[in-house]
Design a protein with these regions (language model features):
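Acidic/aromatic-lined carbohydrate-recognition and catalytic surfaces
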Residues: 3-149
Length: 149
């Protein structure tokens, strides 16, 4: 009886894509604002944050047409957190801060050199070696390289 009551309890939640978070890089990221948002939800008794898929998007930037069900879209990586982790030499400048719409192509172009720098520094870590041992990573990397060629 107690289990049935617990299962029937309602929870409060919100649906908001990560891309809608405030940002200084043109798209919401999984960075400081995301942590602040989750803390605000917790303080207000909201227990569920439903987001749109975070996978690498295909045609039309639709989150429902991803290139992979395992990989995450690099557009949501926080450049500030990469800097704080020591993976970037300098903090990235502000780019399209808190805009109302996302120019995905412009954001990708802006972030690419910083993500490449962070990647080159990350490849020397044990975390990277552990990540690349996951079975899907090699096949996905080959797929993306061929797609880009």
């Amino acid at each position: 009886m107690q289990q049935e009551r617990k299962a029937a309890m309602r929870e409060t939640g919100i649906l908001m894509p990560v891309s809608a978070l405030p940002s200084r890089t043109g798209v919401g990221e999984l960075g400081a604002y995301a942590y602040e948002f989750v803390e605000a939800l917790r303080e207000n008794g909201v227990k569920i944050w439903q987001i749109l898929p975070l996978n690498p998007v295909g045609y039309g930037n639709s989150p429902y047409q991803p290139y992979s069900s395992c990989a995450g879209d690099e557009i949501y990586i926080s450049l500030d957190l990469l800097f704080e982790a020591g993976l970037l030499k300098e903090q990235a400048p502000t780019f399209h801060e808190n805009v109302r719409t996302v120019d995905y192509d412009a954001v990708r172009t802006f972030k690419e050199p910083y993500l490449k720098e962070a990647f080159s520094n990350f490849t020397e870590t044990e975390d990277f070696r552990e990540f690349t041992r996951q079975p899907w990573v090699y096949e996905y990397a080959v797929f993306r390289a061929k797609k880009k060629a």
